[in-house]
Amino acid sequence: MAIRVQSTAFDPGAEVNAMHAANVGVGAVVSFVGYVRDFNDGLEVAGMFLEHYPGMTEKALGKIAVEAQQRWPLLKLEVLHRIGALEPGEPIVFVGAASAHRQAAFDACSFVMDYLKTRAPFWKKENTSDGARWVEGRDSDHAAADRWKQ
């Protein structure tokens, strides 16, 4: 399991390739990459600034990752999230789950993203054509996370 919160850019393809490197037991890798959009809620987005609570954010991500590992037979799990200034088209988040079989990898990847969106302390400020604004959480994110409650 690897949790990274960083201000530097990352290569999603390299992250996917690292998920199965030197582990021939991996039969499936499922990944999600989130990108900065150039448009949101009807406004043009020129950029975004992501803030986090150092220490608390990593702890929250680690707790989510541990829960995923307890639910599914994963061989590897990676969570990487950018902070700082980002421009449209840049990757913000990478979640990768590797398992012997595809369903565990699919489910774990979805679970981690759903919980990351609702439980990890990140704050997004968009620079839009109307000025800067904080991005609010969406009801659909909470509904997606609710499906994993046991």
Model regions and ranges:
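N-terminal, polar/charged subdomain of small-to-medium soluble alpha/beta proteins
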Residues: 1-92, 106-110, 114-150
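Short glycine-rich or small-residue beta-strand-to-loop segments that form or flank ligand, phosphate
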Residues: 92-99
